[in-house]
């Protein structure tokens, strides 16, 4: 079984207290050594759209969210019980249909409001010019090539220069970065589509977010280093 960690796991781990982090790391090491250990308390998340999401008990209130299949265990997120469950219920792990990369996608229907509200203090003297929509000219194929999930295509195309930053927080990193480049006048490089039977975790974009941990030493370095998002999740094109 492949044992992986996601950048969302290390990011959420860093926001816990020191004692909570120690307990989480101990549980993570135990999961890596033997995820089938009867002492591990797995709970299936019935409300999650992704039926492979489970929670693992760390303490009375701390839960690790894992994505578990027959051949893979991925540490996705950690937080206090209710916040951890809420995170999992709003996301799913999927393979992007165009790029072939594994992505943790925020489920569109769970996001009630994206646009930042604009409050008008007084009536404008003139009719305001239509807001620019920097992505309206892009085809579905273009947006998919940049890693935009299918369910977010409509929101991206309707986004304005003002609302884009709020929208970007809900998109996978490679998609938000490509769109940002477009707003600054650039043309992002479109990655080569993966082979049909390729492992979605091997895609260069996925390698930025998910890493296989082959031994305890690797996992310890990934969880302890304050610069883990730069060293462990470095984009393959940037490696020296």
Question: Model regions: which residues?
Answer:
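N-terminal "first-domain core" detector
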Residues: 1-5, 42
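N-terminal pre-P-loop "Q-motif" helix
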Residues: 214-215, 226-240
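A short, surface-exposed loop/turn module that caps and links secondary-structure elements
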Residues: 29-56
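Enriched for short, Lys/Arg-rich terminal
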Residues: 58-160, 164-167, 194
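Interdomain "pre-motor" coupling segment immediately N-terminal to P-loop NTPase/helicase cores
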Residues: 153-215
């Amino acid at each position: 079984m492949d044992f992986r960690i996601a950048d969302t796991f290390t990011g959420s781990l860093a926001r816990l207290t020191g004692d909570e982090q120690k307990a989480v790391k101990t549980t993570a090491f135990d999961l890596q050594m033997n995820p089938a250990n009867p002492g591990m308390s797995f709970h299936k998340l019935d409300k999650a759209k992704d039926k492979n999401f489970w929670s693992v008990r760390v303490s009375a209130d701390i839960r690790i969210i894992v994505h578990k299949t027959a051949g893979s265990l991925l540490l996705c997120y950690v937080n206090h019980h209710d916040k951890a469950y809420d995170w999992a219920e709003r996301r799913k792990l999927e393979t992007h249909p165009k790029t072939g990369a594994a992505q943790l996608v925020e489920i569109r229907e769970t996001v009630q409001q994206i646009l930042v509200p604009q409050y008008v203090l007084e009536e404008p003297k003139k009719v305001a010019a239509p807001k620019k929509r920097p992505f309206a000219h892009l085809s579905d194929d273009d947006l998919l090539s940049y890693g935009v999930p299918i369910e977010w295509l409509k929101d991206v195309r309707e986004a304005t220069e003002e609302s884009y930053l709020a929208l970007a927080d809900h998109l996978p990193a490679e998609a938000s970065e490509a769109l940002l480049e477009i707003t600054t006048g650039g043309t992002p490089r479109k990655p080569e589509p993966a082979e049909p039977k390729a492992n979605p975790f091997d895609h260069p974009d996925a390698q930025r977010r998910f890493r296989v941990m082959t031994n305890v030493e690797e996992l310890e370095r990934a969880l302890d280093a304050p610069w883990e998002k730069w060293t462990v999740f470095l984009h393959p094109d940037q490696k020296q």
